[in-house]
């Protein structure tokens, strides 16, 4: 990618780039513990394989179950708000990671107090600037809508 810069490298697990003003993270195997082969769910794009949005949402659910970063919450928020419903994300996650703790689908989604950063804008220039409290409120409202279905 000619227009890129490395913004974070956590060898050997992950490397973050800004490519054409978009943050892109590449994970190695083992960066986030998942019980499925992520490579089976990728599609080729130029010289790399990428996951489609539904699998990225599953990886984000696994990420927030293991660590709390504003980036993961923001990505999951954005996917749930603009690309697929939270119910679809939860159902897909239950299919691909059946042993993920049920607490992830409720308390973990809405508990953002232990995230150090207040907003994703401290790191990047996101499409939508929201605080961690707004993200928690969004997930709370979405969970209320689907409480009988999960």
Regions found by a protein language model. Give the residues of each.
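Compositionally biased terminal segments of proteins
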Residues: 1-150
């Amino acid at each position: 990618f000619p227009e890129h810069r490395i913004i974070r490298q956590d060898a050997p697990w992950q490397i973050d780039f800004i490519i054409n003003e978009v943050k892109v993270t590449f994970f190695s195997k083992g960066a986030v513990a998942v019980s499925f082969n992520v490579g089976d769910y990728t599609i080729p794009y130029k010289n790399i394989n990428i996951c489609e949005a539904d699998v990225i949402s599953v990886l984000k659910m696994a990420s927030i179950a293991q660590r709390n970063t504003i980036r993961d919450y923001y990505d999951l928020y954005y996917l749930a708000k603009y690309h697929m419903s939270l119910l679809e994300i939860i159902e897909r996650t239950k299919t691909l990671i059946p042993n993920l703790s049920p607490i992830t689908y409720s308390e973990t989604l809405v508990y953002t107090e232990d995230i150090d950063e207040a907003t994703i804008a401290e790191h990047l220039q996101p499409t939508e600037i929201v605080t961690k409290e707004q993200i928690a409120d969004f997930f709370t409202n979405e969970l209320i809508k689907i409480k009988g279905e999960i």
